[in-house]
């Protein structure tokens, strides 16, 4: 059995495989591999529910930091960490970023995108909720999403100013004062 390997350059990971690229008509075991960074893996994961709905057995590769999240979110898929994968485990392969080409061919197809496709750890949520309540304090939560990619990062990052309306309650003096400290 051949074992596929990945290029070491994180910005340009490539799969060395003898297996053909997955096509929508294929009825095969599909290996979806991650060729980009963590943020892209999360973004393109929105396509996984549609891919699973096609009925193909799925081997989904992810960054180790996403493994537990993906196991909860996509229980029908077999989840594997980045690294070498035996070709005997799949018939076709596709980089996760290429799924958009197949599943989002036009603007209307974005309406099919599922909301809430990632499933939080409910036990951890309850644990955190109990801890926050036990402190008796109010907590401020910060949000940051930025990309370090010099080519596409600026168009895929959110400056705090764009989030103000969603984050600040106009009638809440505390949120107003917290925001003033950072803007």
Regions found by a protein language model. Give the residues of each.
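Catalytic machinery of carbohydrate-active enzymes
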Residues: 1-183
């Amino acid at each position: 059995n051949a074992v596929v390997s990945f290029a070491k350059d994180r910005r340009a990971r490539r799969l060395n495989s003898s297996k053909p690229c997955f096509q929508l008509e294929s009825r095969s075991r599909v290996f979806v591999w991650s060729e980009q960074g963590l943020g892209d893996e999360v973004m393109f994961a929105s396509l996984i529910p549609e891919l699973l709905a096609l009925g193909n057995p799925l081997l989904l590769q992810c960054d180790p930091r996403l493994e537990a999240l993906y196991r909860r979110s996509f229980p029908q898929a077999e989840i594997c960490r980045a690294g070498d994968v035996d070709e005997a485990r799949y018939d076709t392969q596709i980089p996760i970023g290429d799924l958009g080409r197949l599943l989002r061919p036009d603007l209307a197809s974005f309406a099919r995108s599922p909301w809430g496709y990632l499933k939080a750890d409910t036990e951890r949520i309850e644990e955190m909720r109990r801890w926050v309540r036990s402190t008796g304090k109010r907590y401020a939560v910060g949000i940051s999403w930025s990309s370090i990619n010099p080519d596409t990062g600026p168009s895929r990052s959110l400056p705090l100013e764009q989030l103000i309306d969603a984050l600040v309650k106009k009638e809440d003096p505390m949120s107003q004062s917290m925001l003033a400290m950072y803007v």
